[in-house]
Swiss-Prot record:
Membrane-spanning segments: 10-30
Protein name as catalogued: Potassium-transporting ATPase KdpC subunit
Family: Belongs to the KdpC family.
Gene that encodes the chain: kdpC
Described function: Part of the high-affinity ATP-driven potassium transport (or Kdp) system, which catalyzes the hydrolysis of ATP coupled with the electrogenic transport of potassium into the cytoplasm. This subunit acts as a catalytic chaperone that increases the ATP-binding affinity of the ATP-hydrolyzing subunit KdpB by the formation of a transient KdpB/KdpC/ATP ternary complex.
Length: 186
């Protein structure tokens, strides 16, 4: 009888500690010391939330930088999401997969060997908000033409916004770069 009572007490104490006190402590620490990160690293522009620093968006206008292709189409197709239940993730397709090849041809003009790998392939999460500086610089002439500004101004903006990779190439956040473009004075 004593063993059963001890087991029940230990179970209740463990449930209170692990199910209430620990999550409460982690939530409080997050909200006090890491408020921006704990709430999704949201970015505001013109007093409204326009996205997250951590999740890529689908950009199609020629006046903006385009992010990486998304294996989950940035969850813009609710029917597809409903069918396979995937909200993020890579495609896990091999190099010879016909669907992958078709998707890469869709994202890249066929025969253009001057394309960075991140312009043609999706990331592991399918929602990567960054592109390499090299990719951004290759998009600069298109953006400069669409905005009627010099390519050097766009390149300077890219260099100013680049983040150093530790074991990777230097990269830029596409949403932050596009907001900086909109803020740029002609």
């Amino acid at each position: 009888m004593n063993t059963i009572r001890n087991s029940i007490c230990l179970t209740i104490i463990t449930m209170v500690l692990c199910g209430f006190l620990f999550p409460l402590a982690i939530t409080l620490i997050g909200q006090i010391f890491f408020y921006q990160q704990a709430n999704g690293s949201l970015i505001t522009y013109d007093n409204r939330i326009v996205g997250s620093k951590l999740i890529g968006q689908h950009w199609t206008e020629t006046r903006y930088f385009h992010g990486r292709p998304s294996a989950v189409d940035y969850n813009m197709n609710p029917e597809k999401l409903y069918k396979n239940g995937v909200s993020s993730g890579g495609s896990n397709e091999s190099n010879g997969n016909t669907e992958l090849i078709a998707r890469m041809k869709h994202h890249v003009k066929f025969g253009n060997s001057n394309v960075t790998i991140d312009a043609a392939t999706s990331s592991g999460s399918g929602l990567d908000p960054h592109i390499t500086v090299e990719n951004a610089l290759k998009q600069a002439p298109r953006i400069a033409d669409a905005r009627h500004i010099s390519t050097s101004r766009v390149a300077d903006l890219i260099q100013h916004r680049k983040q150093r990779g530790v074991l990777t190439n230097d990269y830029v956040n596409v949403l932050e770069l596009n907001i900086a473009l909109d803020k740029m004075k002609d």
